[in-house]
Amino acid sequence: MITLGDDGAMHLANALSKNTTLTTLDLHWTEIEKEGSLYLANALKKNNTLTTLDLKWNKIGDEGAQYLADALGQNKALVTLQLAANGISGKGVYHLANALIENTTLNTLNLDSNKIGTDGAQHLGNALCNNS
């Protein structure tokens, strides 16, 4: 495990917002929390080459999921977003589901080992019915 944390995520996000070649970024199990996900989300709004972002086993929670969902509204490059085991509940999934309605580029969203519950599953189901 690499301890990157929110400060490390900030530095990576600054570079990512300017990078034009990287397609995959694996940041699983690096101690990123909601603040770090905000930095990464802001970078995703500017980046148009990253296709895979792996944030499994971090601590972004519902707020972090909302930040990333907001970025998905603008980002048209990301194809795979790994968010397994991040403490995301139905509240966070609500924002991700709404982003899926608008974003037609993302085709893999991993929410394994989160407690999305029935509400989260319903939000995702509704979004998938309306995603074209």
Model-derived regions, located:
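Leucine-rich repeat
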Residues: D6-A15, K34-N42, D62-A71, G90-N98, ...
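Inter-repeat linker/turn residues at the boundaries of leucine-rich repeats
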Residues: S17-T20, K45-N48, G73-K76, I101-T104, ...
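Conserved hydrophobic beta-strand positions in leucine-rich repeat
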Residues: T23-L27, L53-L55, L81-L83, N107-L111
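Intrinsically disordered, low-complexity polyampholyte segments enriched for Lys and acidic residues
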Residues: K34-E35, N42-N48, K56-K59, E63, ...
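Leucine-rich solenoid repeat scaffolds
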Residues: L81, L109, G125, C129-N131
